[in-house]
């Protein structure tokens, strides 16, 4: 979501916001790396299923925080539920939020990434990011 909003801002000059009330968990790449390292470095057997997320926020909160970093306006569009293929997303209140309490307690872990830190990373590295058309097949073998 942050990737798409930042890319939209840099490519079109605006952040498009359709279903603003959907709650989303977001995991920053630095937090992912540190969480995996915490698991690998742990000397105890703490096998289990864990949720990982740097934070949970609504699409609206994320959009306006991305806007602060990139300086592009948020343009709110009214989503047409008949044009949304994912039936779960047809409601304005679908909630994807997750709890990371179990992981934080088990590994004494603190998630640190924010919308701002993730957006700045994308913004600062934008020219080096390989952009693809999601509608076309892309051959990554040459990388």
Give the location of each predicted region.
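Residues that recognize and position ribonucleotide moieties
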Residues: 25, 55, 96-97
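A general structural signal marking secondary-structure boundaries and capping sites
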Residues: 9-13, 42-43, 70-74, 107, ...
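Amphipathic terminal alpha-helices
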Residues: 114-143
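Core catalytic loop region at the nicotinamide-binding pocket of NAD(P)H-dependent oxidoreductases
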Residues: 13-17, 39-52, 129-138
